[in-house]
């Protein structure tokens, strides 16, 4: 099939197994039949609300069942869903919604005050829909989400006047390495294919050949399809795409009841639900998960866990070994990719055979190229940029210049080259070296240093500032501010962090401070980031 429409697949599954769970959060369970009906009602509400065929629907939500209902509704209506980082501040949200041409924003009502302050600047938004919660009713200018999904329309499934197509988009906004968020444009057909076309090779599940094929392989009274505990945010590609892979098989996606990650709660839920899959992002999750298991080994029955999957952040061989000691039936899958390049590489770890940190097997459609377009030969020691071909995004939304820099024609075919440097070992495996830019990856969140530097430099007593990443046992890296003061007062980390949090998302605020006499910029105004980081490491006692 060459025109996959994700809603068609999910609707076929809902018809076959309407009483099976699709979405779980704590004691709340949305069956496949309810998932389909609620998404139909929301899709009808969007179409009746006057959205255009090019509409974008922003999900400004914490993890919750409504998140995936919004995506299902957008797929049904043939319009594009977009993710929204719920940690963003007002200015970041204005940029994102304006850049995306968002016509609908579905938000947790707890964000109402933030949106109220910027709503007048978002003239493109036609519909505001609030997911209410205790203490946070829908504001007067928004529709209550439950009102929007209360009644499924008589004509189902819902389709907009412009219909559905495999060309319908999903926009995945990523902070990336070059400043403000960029919207990666995935055609539904390409996305469905790159995510396994309804299959999952790691579990031996074959791709399907038609939407009905997804339903035909399900038995309402037979073995349970996958139940995946997605611990990381659905607003990021790792969580979102992992959820899609599970739903494409007719499985259930479970999210944690709490807003923040709690390892004890995770293992409680895994045991209660007998989850067979767990999705995380590297050290920020695996470290606390392992710590609570080590404190009380044997507390939980984790025999149901068959896979622990991670992508978006490197994590250690030691953590993999530790988790496998407690999840004895599991395989750990560590994937290397990005929003614009799915499937660059992967590693699989089993008890006694744990993959090393940053070691990956190249994907079947991947290669490593030098900057002048030559393939890197295995064992040559030459460094190059990892690239993937096959099913790729169209490019970045409204940014042809950046699209041209990332999506290249090499050896006569189109490749996505997101900027990750690597060497190819003699056995063909990949040794990942990292992103060539100065982007800082802290717990899976990408932070662009210049953005934080500019915020720091608005402080009345900061003359100049540079931001670097320093090692962090849990988050991979943490933000360090190297600051040149004006000399009037003694700068304090708490004050500078609060200053940044007032302007940017909290995860971008510095957690370390190094005060210097001079930043030491070159005559052209540029700074030596390598030297700045070395200076920070020395000052913090982290060198060597």
Predicted segments, located by residue:
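Conserved AMP-binding A3 loop
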Residues: 31-33, 169-197, 201-208
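AMP-binding/adenylate-forming catalytic core of the ANL superfamily
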Residues: 88, 94-95, 103-107, 268, ...
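Gly/Ser/Thr-rich phosphate-binding loop
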Residues: 146, 248-249, 275-280, 290-354, ...
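Conserved pre-ATP/AMP-binding loop-to-beta segment of ANL
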Residues: 152-173, 180, 185, 217-227
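Conserved AMP-binding/adenylation subdomain of ANL enzymes
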Residues: 192-230, 235-276
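Conserved beta-loop-beta connector loops within the AMP-binding
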Residues: 367-387, 424-427, 489-493, 528
């Amino acid at each position: 099939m060459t025109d996959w429409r994700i809603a068609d697949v999910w609707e076929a599954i809902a018809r076959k197994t309407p009483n099976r769970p699709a979405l779980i959060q704590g004691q709340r369970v949305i069956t496949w039949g309810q998932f389909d009906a609620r998404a139909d009602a929301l899709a009808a509400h969007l179409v009746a609300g006057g959205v255009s065929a090019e509409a974008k629907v922003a999900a400004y939500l914490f993890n919750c069942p409504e998140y995936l209902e919004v995506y299902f509704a957008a797929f049904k209506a043939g319009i594009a869903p977009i993710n929204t980082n719920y940690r963003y501040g007002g200015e970041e949200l204005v940029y994102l919604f304006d850049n995306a041409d968002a016509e609908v924003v579905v938000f947790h009502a707890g964000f109402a005050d933030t949106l109220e302050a910027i709503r007048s600047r978002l003239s493109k938004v036609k519909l505001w829909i609030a997911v209410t919660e205790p203490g946070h009713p829908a504001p007067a200018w928004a529709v209550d989400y439950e009102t929007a999904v209360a009644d499924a329309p008589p004509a189902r499934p819902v389709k907009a006047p412009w219909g559905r197509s495999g060309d319908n988009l999903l926009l995945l906004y990523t902070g990336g390495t070059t400043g403000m968020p960029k919207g990666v444009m995935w055609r539904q057909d390409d996305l469905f294919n790159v995510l396994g076309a309804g299959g999952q090779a790691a579990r031996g599940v074959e791709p399907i050949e038609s939407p009905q094929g997804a339903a035909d392989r399900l038995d309402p009274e037979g073995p349970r399809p996958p139940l995946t505990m997605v611990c990381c945010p659905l607003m990021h590609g790792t969580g979102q795409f992992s959820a899609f892979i599970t739903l494409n098989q007719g499985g259930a996606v479970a999210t944690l009841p709490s807003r923040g990650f709690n390892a004890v709660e995770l293992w409680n839920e895994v045991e209660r639900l007998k989850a067979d899959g767990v999705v995380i992002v590297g050290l920020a999750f695996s470290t606390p998960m392992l710590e609570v298991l080590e404190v009380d080994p044997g507390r939980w029955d984790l025999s149901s866990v068959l896979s622990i999957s991670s992508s978006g952040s490197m994590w250690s061989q030691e953590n993999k070994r530790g988790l496998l000691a407690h999840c004895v039936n599991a395989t750990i899958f560590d994937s290397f990719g990005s929003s614009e390049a799915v499937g660059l590489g992967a590693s699989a770890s089993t008890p006694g055979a744990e993959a090393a940190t940053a070691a990956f097997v190249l994907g079947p459609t991947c290669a490593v190229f030098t900057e002048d377009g030559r393939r890197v030969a295995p064992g040559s020691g030459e460094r190059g940029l990892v690239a993937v071909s096959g099913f790729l995004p169209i490019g970045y939304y409204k940014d042809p210049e950046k699209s041209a820099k990332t999506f290249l024609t090499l050896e006569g075919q189109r490749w996505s080259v997101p900027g990750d440097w690597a060497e190819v070992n003699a056995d063909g495996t990949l040794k990942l070296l990292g992103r060539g830019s100065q982007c800082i990856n802290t717990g899976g969140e990408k932070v662009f240093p210049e953005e934080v530097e500019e915020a720091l430099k608005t402080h009345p007593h900061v003359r100049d500032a540079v931001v670097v990443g320093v090692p962090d046992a849990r988050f991979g890296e943490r933000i360090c501010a190297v600051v040149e003061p004006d000399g009037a007062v003694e700068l304090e980390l708490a004050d500078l962090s609060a200053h940044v949090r007032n302007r940017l998302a909290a995860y971008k605020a510095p957690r370390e401070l190094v005060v210097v006499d001079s930043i030491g910029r070159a005559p052209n105004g540029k700074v030596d980031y390598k030297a700045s980081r070395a200076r920070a490491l020395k000052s913090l006692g982290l060198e060597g």
